[in-house]
Structure formats: structure tokens, C-alpha cells
A protein has these predicted regions:
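A cross-family phosphate/adenosyl-ligand binding-site feature
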Residues: 2-148, 153-213
Length: 213
């Protein structure tokens, strides 16, 4: 057998082994919270983002707002959404203020993602209001000086919620998933994050960096 053919066989095996090692190295050993608010029309994209986050980090804890936990819409049933989140994460959903509070004192998360984050939740975060499971999770998490990543989805992002976004942008430990207008003609004030960038934004935040559009 020619020398070149002999060398080809171990080279292919070596490449396969290296690929497996790379996949293990790429999995980041961090615990990430993934909180979903009631922007129901974007929940399908949020689930895609959750899949990508779970593929990037070793542990993911699902969290939903009370509105999300209790509301069935034309976009789907609340129960089905929560079961899907539990399937992806292999972890029970946190859906109450009481269940979210230990995130702080027990330092349960390395990073928290809110995806999607509604205008209502943006306003509460900007003004220190803690009356939902998601805002409690955020407050409890931030007390540990750990990163919070926000993926806005709101029809008034360039109207009433612009004030909230502006207040949160310069705050320490808060990062945003890159966002922009989703329908300038029919909804000129609406802003939605690029959900395909959620995992990248999370990884950047762990390094103290804001992912740029």
C-alpha cells in the first residue's frame, strides 16, 4: 500500500477524536437562569434560544413570569410551554416570587437571561419594582454582582419603554441582547432582540462584555 494511503487512516481517526474533544471544551461549566416573560408572539423564538443556551452551558434553570404561567393564548398553552422548558433544561420551572427569592442568598446562578423581556418587566427593572417571579429573580441575582442579560421584546420600545431601556443600558452587570425594529412600517415603535444571539450575548456577559450588533 502506498505510504500516503497508510497515513490517511490515522489522520481521519485523529480528526474525529479532536472533534469530540472540542465539543466537550465548548460546553461552559456555568449555571444559567432563563426567564420568560409574556411576549407570547415571541415564545417560539425564545424556545429556540433556550435550546441554544442549553447546548452552550452545563446547567440551565427555567423561570417564567406569573403571566406566562397562567395565560393560554393563540400562540400556545401555558402548560405546554412550561413542560417544554422543563424538557429542554431537565429542571423544574420556577414560577413564583417565593421560589425565585433563594436565587440571591444561595447564589444559585452564574448568569440570568430574561428572554423575552416585555416593556412591563423593563419598567419594573428600571424602577426597582419586585412583584413577579422574574423581577425577583433579577433582583436576587444582581445582589451577587453577577451578570443579567436582557432580550427586549416590546411594542413601545421607541416610545414609553425607551425610558426604561435608557435607564438600564448604563447599569453595572446589566447587558442586552442586540435589538432593533422588527416592523418599522406597521409598528414603528416596536423593538425585538435578535434571539439567535442570546447564547453569544450570555457568553460575552460572563466575560464582562456587551455583545455588539
Amino acid at each position: 500500500m502506498p505510504w500516503r494511503e497508510v497515513q490517511d487512516v490515522p489522520r481521519r481517526e485523529s480528526t474525529h477524536i479532536q472533534s469530540d474533544l472540542e465539543r466537550k471544551i465548548d460546553l461552559i461549566d456555568k449555571t444559567v437562569g432563563f426567564a420568560v416573560c409574556g411576549s407570547f408572539c415571541t415564545h417560539h423564538k425564545a424556545m429556540e434560544a433556550l435550546e441554544q443556551v442549553k447546548a452552550r452551558f452545563t446547567h440551565v434553570v427555567p423561570i417564567v413570569s406569573e403571566c406566562t404561567a397562567d395565560t393560554d393564548t393563540r400562540f400556545g398553552k401555558a402548560h405546554d410551554l412550561m413542560r417544554e422548558m422543563e424538557r429542554i433544561c431537565d429542571h423544574r420551572v420556577i414560577s413564583t416570587v417565593k421560589a425565585a427569592e433563594p436565587i440571591g442568598p444561595q447564589k444559585l446562578l452564574d448568569l440570568l437571561i430574561i428572554c423575552p423581556c416585555t416593556g412591563n418587566t423593563l419598567g419594573k427593572l428600571a424602577n426597582g419594582v419586585t412583584d413577579t417571579s422574574v423581577t425577583m429573580a433579577a433582583k436576587a441575582h444582581l445582589r451577587n454582582s453577577r451578570p443579567l442579560v436582557i432580550a427586549p421584546s416590546t411594542n413601545d420600545g421607541l416610545a414609553a419603554s425607551a425610558v426604561s431601556i435608557g435607564a438600564l443600558l448604563p447599569r453595572k452587570y446589566i447587558y442586552f441582547v442586540p435589538f432593533g425594529q422588527d416592523d418599522p412600517e406597521r409598528k414603528p415603535t416596536s423593538l425585538v432582540s435578535d434571539f439567535s444571539l442570546v447564547a453569544d450575548a450570555a457568553q460575552a456577559a460572563l466575560e464582562g462584555k456587551q455583545l455588539q450588533p
